[in-house]
């Protein structure tokens, strides 16, 4: 028996770090989120003015301290938000909510493991009014800082639903009157 026990309920106390101007702005505007701390570099001093009423703790760091904490790469854009993620619906809850609408578009992805690809797809989904993305738990990334950054705010409005079995998810959607159009890329031997 291992002396190390992993308790996924404690994992990082549910605190997420979101960075980048668009991602942080979208998270600050999401009333479902519990906001913990907004950290900005002095170079982004005007950023906090708009959100002073939304968040209790705002920390303004000198540029050299901000760089020491968050790195020299430009991906943070001088803005970091510490927050707790909000409750996201599972497949059954999502279908129940969406069934009240006249139309609903869902994208199902399998074997897309790069968080930056998922983030890019989320941006496209937001543009085309796709309400959700369904992915397999074993072959997809969790919602991480890099996924939030590449989604550029779309992760706040597009539901990200991780399921154990995609085939069962498709069957469930069909039983709930969804028309499922499937595409798979050809295998190497089919080429």
What are these regions (language model features)?
Residues 30-31, 101, 176, 187:
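Alpha-helix C-cap/termination motif
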Residues 96-182:
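RNA substrate-binding interface of SAM-dependent RNA methyltransferases
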Residues 183-191:
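Single conserved hydrophobic/aromatic residue that forms the stacking wall/gate
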């Amino acid at each position: 028996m291992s002396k190390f026990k992993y308790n996924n309920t404690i994992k990082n106390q549910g605190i997420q770090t979101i960075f980048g101007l668009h991602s942080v702005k979208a998270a600050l505007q999401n009333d479902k989120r519990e906001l913990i701390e907004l950290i900005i570099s002095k170079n982004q001093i005007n950023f906090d003015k708009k959100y002073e009423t939304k968040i209790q703790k705002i920390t303004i760091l000198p540029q050299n301290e901000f760089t020491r904490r968050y790195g020299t790469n430009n991906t943070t854009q001088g803005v970091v938000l510490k927050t707790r993620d909000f409750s996201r619906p599972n497949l059954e809850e999502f279908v129940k909510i969406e069934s009240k609408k006249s139309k609903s578009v869902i994208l199902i992805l399998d074997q897309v493991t790069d968080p930056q690809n998922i983030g890019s797809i989320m941006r496209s989904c937001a543009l085309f009014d796709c309400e959700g993305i369904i992915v397999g738990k074993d072959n997809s990334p969790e919602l991480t800082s890099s996924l939030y950054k590449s989604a550029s705010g779309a992760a706040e409005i597009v539901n990200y639903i991780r399921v154990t079995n995609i085939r069962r998810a498709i069957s469930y959607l069909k039983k709930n009157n969804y028309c499922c159009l499937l595409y798979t890329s050809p295998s190497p031997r089919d080429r």
